[in-house]
Amino acid sequence: MVKFLKQNKAVILLQGRYAGKKAVIIKSFDDGNRDRPYGHCLVAGLKKYPSKVIRKDSAKKTAKKSRVKCFIKLVNYQHLMPTRYTLDVDLKEVATLDALQSKDKKVAALKEAKAKLEERFKTGKNRWFFTKLRF
């Protein structure tokens, strides 16, 4: 079977708290491990999408509308829908498995991931990833 759920692939979560949210695969575990004996992956995604920015907005308002909130999570392959898009954001060093072990490490990883995703949004690349999924 061809492994197509690779790193940097954009996916949509189908189950759980973040169902319908877009995420990007950071690391995939095709054969599972001792804790999770099924195929799963580490994803980072957008909890809250940036709002629409218009020309007449002030710089302060534009900065506020450009904010994103993100999440880092381990997800079963069954709960993902892959898309044709890829997102070349380097989150491999930011979000690791040991970052999920303790609260303070996770908070630090979330801040770094948020900064990288906001910077990617401000450059105007990967526009599809930063738009809310309408359904």
From Swiss-Prot:
Annotated Gene Ontology cellular component terms: cytosol; cytosolic large ribosomal subunit; cytosolic ribosome
What the entry lists under PROSITE patterns is as follows: RIBOSOMAL_L27E (PS01107)
Under the heading Pfam families, the entry gives: Ribosomal_L27e
Tree of life domain: Eukaryota
GO BP, sorted A to Z: translation
Transmembrane segments annotated in the record for this chain: none
Q: Does the keyword Transmembrane apply?
A: no
Stored Gene3D superfamilies: 2.30.30.770
**Keyword annotations of the record:** Ribonucleoprotein, Ribosomal protein
Name the Gene Ontology molecular function terms of this record.
Answer: mRNA binding; structural constituent of ribosome
The similarity annotation says:
Belongs to the eukaryotic ribosomal protein eL27 family.
Q: Which PANTHER family match?
A: 60S RIBOSOMAL PROTEIN L27
Please give the name of this protein.
Large ribosomal subunit protein eL27x
Which source organism?
A: Arabidopsis thaliana (Mouse-ear cress)
Q: What is the lineage of its organism?
A: Eukaryota, Viridiplantae, Streptophyta, Embryophyta, Tracheophyta
